[in-house]
């Protein structure tokens, strides 16, 4: 089983230097707010009823189950774009397929944990990963040094952070990774739900990504290049292989027109890294060959993820020793990776 430190962001290299101030976080759900950024149009008709839901201290799956029970259908009929934190106040869209039915009185679902704030009808369901970003509002209490936090926040605002997967991806003390490994390595893997399977596979791929990125930062820094690197274009998922770095490509990298990437392990017919970059990644993946074989057997498609994460529309305000941070991250990015760069939350719940 993996030691807890192996999935802890605290043990991974940071982009910004300097001592981080201490602070208190998540004393209440209101200290961590997440607003899904998704532009939708009300079609006025259709068999898919979309719900804009505010939830407090409840996870996304809990709300999906509650919606399904209320409508008297299988949870498979309920869709959402992404999972949101439990220990938080969050806003996100759900859709539920109810062919031939009038709009239900969804307000009957409202309670302290969940509130339906908007209802629309659409001809299409909400697909996973459909939202473009999340807006975060984070409150830090009793910050030990305003100057230290301001300096680190300026660095994050200008340069971004390392795009690690957050610790919540791995469960308590890395339990998701350990359980996923036991499941994959079993002579006869037990049948598990689709959601648990997705959770397990995501935990393994995220762990490998963090390991590769951390070692790359240790050896080469955030802008260190290797022949055969796979880079991603700004504002898209389009990637290409750099056969040889020249001055123009290095300038595009410095200007954040392109980004270095690391692998999300899986099956691929067309390797996207070559030469030095491929040799570096394979040297780190080799000890996990049994994981890689299992991912390929399960036909998990390989992908790439940027190493650098840019923070959009960053803001900071103060009330005494308490700071409020506001910023936007693309879907799939973690606010905890931003916090890890600027504040020491030792002993605090994440």
Curated annotation (Swiss-Prot):
Q: Name one GO biological process term.
A: tRNA pseudouridine synthesis
| GO MF terms held by the record | RNA binding; tRNA pseudouridine(13) synthase activity
Q: Which Pfam families match?
A: TruD
- Enzyme Commission number, as recorded: 5.4.99.27
The TRUD domain extends over: 160-310
The protein's annotated catalytic reaction(s) are: uridine(13) in tRNA = pseudouridine(13) in tRNA
Assigned keywords, A-Z: Isomerase, tRNA processing
Q: Name one GO cellular component term.
A: cytosol
Q: Where is the active site?
A: 85
The UniProt entry, under Gene3D superfamilies, shows: TruD, catalytic domain, TruD, insertion domain
Q: Which CDD domains match?
A: PseudoU_synth_EcTruD (cd02575)
HAMAP family cross-referenced by the UniProt entry: TruD (MF_01082)
* Protein role: Responsible for synthesis of pseudouridine from uracil-13 in transfer RNAs.
Family designation: Belongs to the pseudouridine synthase TruD family.
Task: State what protein this is by name.
Answer: tRNA pseudouridine synthase D
Q: Source species, please?
A: Idiomarina loihiensis (strain ATCC BAA-735 / DSM 15497 / L2-TR)
Q: Which gene encodes it?
A: truD
